[in-house]
Amino acid sequence: MTAPSMSRPDDVRPEVLDFKPYVPGLSIDEIRDRFGLADVVKLASNENPLGTSPVVQRTLKTKADLAFRYAQSGNPRLTRAIAAHHGVAPERVVAGNGSDEIIDLLIRVRATPGKHNIVAFRPCFSIYELQAKFCGLEFRQADLRPDFTFDWDAFLAATDENTAIAFVTTPDNPSGWCPPVSELEHVARTLPPSCLFVIDEAYMDFCGDEAAHSLLSRLDAFPNIAVLRTFSKSFGLAGLRLGYGILPERLADYLHRVRLPFSVNILAEEAGLAALEDTVFRSETLRVTAEGRAYIAEGLTALGCEVMPSWANFIMFRPPTDATDLFEALLRRGIIIRPLKSYGLPQHLRVSVGNADENRRFIEACKEILPHA
């Protein structure tokens, strides 16, 4: 008897057949091997310029013998610490294996295939679209304005009574744009009542003035808002995969019910607790990022690049020459940044803010490659 083929289209859900997976930035090892380089700088994935907090490193060493244990269900110590950090009720907080897990759970909990749609801007963080389509949902997008600010009229026009979730990232990725909080208030009040407004604030720590840009402190006035945050950026825990949502309490309860057990492992939880306590490291991260962002913006502008204003830990820019040529020339010099073709921006690039030496190497390499202004 012949074994059934696993390549038949009817063996998987239709949504999977043409599914395009998330494409991460190139790794240091890939570029070392490709070009035979000993020293490679990665400025592609918006990671912490200072690495990992020394307090977190000591905690991981001290707690390593707990690796055989399961974390406590729901990570109550961590959710209480996050709640205290933001001044919200612990019942609002759901921790996840990166904020990606919270995005996935929100879509699967709130949206019904064949009925609901999901709305976001174009371009946007690709996970919104990937998970919406994987769940068999219609995914709608509103274009940004030519200057990459948010066209809220187009965004609201894309929604209707069947919109389960409207996603916005602020500061935005890849542009770095961060709208004033008054605009978010207007949208929250104007969206259809049944629509959940999910504000992804992965980069909010870097904006400089959260009160002017975030609704997190005003959630009681907006029952249709969920806010996402991450430990990957200012806390320096990208490799441990730890994020969280601050949600309406009833919705948070549903997510706790359906999430996979122990998705936040015990060492990630201990690292998150330590990171919240290390305010010195976080403050230094924000200082280094602000200084580096200004240095990179000034350097690129002097080289004739069109530099987008940024409130995040990265800068999007358009070079005066072909973006792919610059990207590849930087790779040959051992510097990895992010091409934005996958975002529909083939002539733009995104560079993460690194430490002072990494930023200097990037600008010096650009000076060698780009025609002098």
Swiss-Prot record:
CDD domains for this protein: AAT_like
Keyword Kinase carried by entry: no
Pathway annotation: Amino-acid biosynthesis; L-histidine biosynthesis; L-histidine from 5-phospho-alpha-D-ribose 1-diphosphate: step 7/9
InterPro entries: Aminotrans_II_pyridoxalP_BS, Aminotransferase_I/II_large, HisP_aminotrans, HistidinolP_aminotransfase, PyrdxlP-dep_Trfase, PyrdxlP-dep_Trfase_major, PyrdxlP-dep_Trfase_small
EC code(s) of this entry: 2.6.1.9
Entry keyword set: Amino-acid biosynthesis, Aminotransferase, Histidine biosynthesis, Pyridoxal phosphate, Transferase
Cofactor requirements of the protein: pyridoxal 5'-phosphate
Transmembrane segments: none
Gene3D superfamilies: Aspartate Aminotransferase, domain 1 (3.90.1150.10), Type I PLP-dependent aspartate aminotransferase-like (Major domain) (3.40.640.10)
N6-(pyridoxal phosphate)lysine sites (modified residues): K233
GO BP of this protein: L-histidine biosynthetic process
Subunit structure: Homodimer.
Sequence similarity: Belongs to the class-II pyridoxal-phosphate-dependent aminotransferase family. Histidinol-phosphate aminotransferase subfamily.
HAMAP family hit by this protein: HisC_aminotrans_2
Annotated protein name in UniProt: Histidinol-phosphate aminotransferase
Species name: Nitratidesulfovibrio vulgaris (strain ATCC 29579 / DSM 644 / CCUG 34227 / NCIMB 8303 / VKM B-1760 / Hildenborough) (Desulfovibrio vulgaris)
Gene: hisC
